[in-house]
A protein has these predicted regions:
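ER/Golgi luminal nucleotide-sugar-dependent glycosyltransferases, focusing on the catalytic module
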Residues: 2-374
């Protein structure tokens, strides 16, 4: 065989092999895939755990929903929260404040993981006193680009929020209704896809790409069996790692309302383990915080809605991913009505309603926005 012919044959074989692998990895997956994401199984490596310093004063016995606020000093004055005290029991954590070793109140063990550190610390240190009315989890600045309100004003959203209606069906609801910058649209690439992996490599400074690409492995770390086995036992209902064509559809930006029962369906130790994953990990705050923004709805959406069970044995069969995605991304028109009483809106698509929200340029508000819109 001539050398040029041999070289051409080798190239054909290599090309065919690569093409086969690409097609195989991206082959259609069966519907109704189930995942054993019912319990946090991560095992912390640290022998010592942080002291409890995140107690919210006066929470025990409160008849109002808790408003859990994760803020930094740069968020500015928090006086805007005072007007909400009639509706909520305020639990405000300033995560970059110096530690007060004499106090057990409203402190976090470290400024890591963005809002997730505050949220988990609240659940851990107030586990026995979550209000019957539920809890709302938000960021500390009043005006933020992702607040789903024409003026991006969280005080308006929270004053209008109907907590009872929001929790009635599923026991959990993200505070955003518009789908922009979420993974709700079908056009958003699956987190484990080759497209996402390539994007993370080609644009390493893109935190969204980095967190999306890391999600399959992280879900295996958090929900996997003891010893890091990514194949959960049959009693846990399937695997824990996303395939290349499996997409977790989730709303942006880690502000949500959740019922007490949904928080208590997981043990306090699970929240401790999840917080330790942040404290012990090496990922950047943006990446770890964004990854957990994909996890909240997995933890809290009402189990009966998508935790499939065998009709004969009632054995646990895992979370149905398709149903989970549907619950995580309700139509915008339904969402605005359910959460904020903005009903019968016109010119609505699946993920937006005209005039309700507009994505600001570069995901930023003008520097003088707060001064001109208070």
């Amino acid at each position: 065989m001539r050398r040029t012919t041999r070289r051409a044959l080798v190239n054909v074989v290599l090309f065919s092999t690569v093409l086969f692998l690409i097609l195989y990895l991206n082959r259609p997956q069966p519907k109704n895939k189930k995942f054993a994401w019912n319990e946090i199984r991560y095992k912390p490596s640290s022998a010592t755990l942080p002291e409890a310093r995140g107690v919210c004063p006066g929470l025990a016995g409160s008849s109002k929903p808790a408003l859990v606020v994760s803020r930094v000093a740069a968020d500015g004055e928090q006086i805007w929260l005072d007007a909400l005290a009639k509706l909520y029991h305020l639990c405000v954590y300033t995560v970059d404040a110096p530690t007060d070793k004499k106090s057990k109140h409203l402190q976090v063990p470290a400024n890591r993981g963005h809002e997730a550190m505050t949220y988990l610390t609240f659940m851990i240190d107030n586990y026995d006193h979550i209000p019957a009315a539920g809890a709302v989890f938000i960021h500390g600045a009043r005006f933020q680009w992702h607040n789903d309100e024409p003026n991006y004003d969280n005080s308006v959203l929270l004053a209008a929020l109907n907590v009872t209606s929001a929790l009635k069906t599923w026991g959990y609801h993200n505070l955003r209704c518009d789908w922009s910058v979420s993974t709700c649209p079908a056009s958003a690439a699956p987190q484990g896809s080759l497209e996402t992996s390539f994007q993370a490599v080609l644009v390493p400074w893109d935190d969204r790409a980095a967190s999306d690409a890391a999600l399959p492995k992280v879900l295996a770390e958090l929900f996997g069996a003891i010893g890091g086995n990514e194949k959960a036992s049959s009693k846990n209902g399937g695997g824990v790692r996303l395939g290349t064509t499996d997409a977790v559809r989730a709303q942006c930006c880690a502000q949500f309302v959740v019922a007490r029962e949904r928080i208590l369906q997981h043990s306090r130790d699970e929240y401790v383990a999840l917080r330790q994953w942040i404290l012990e990990g090496s990922r950047s705050d943006l990446v770890s915080g964004r990854i957990l923004s994909y996890v909240w709805h997995i933890l809290f959406l009402k189990p009966g809605e998508f935790h499939r069970k065998n009709s004969e044995s009632a054995a646990y069969e895992g979370i149905d991913l398709e149903q989970l995605n549907t619950r995580a991304c309700p139509r915008a028109e339904e969402c605005y009505c359910r959460l904020y009483g903005r009903c019968n809106l016109e010119r609505c698509a699946a993920g937006s309603c005209y005039g309700q929200y507009r994505l600001p340029p570069d995901l930023k508000l003008p520097k003088d926005w707060a001064d001109t819109h208070e």
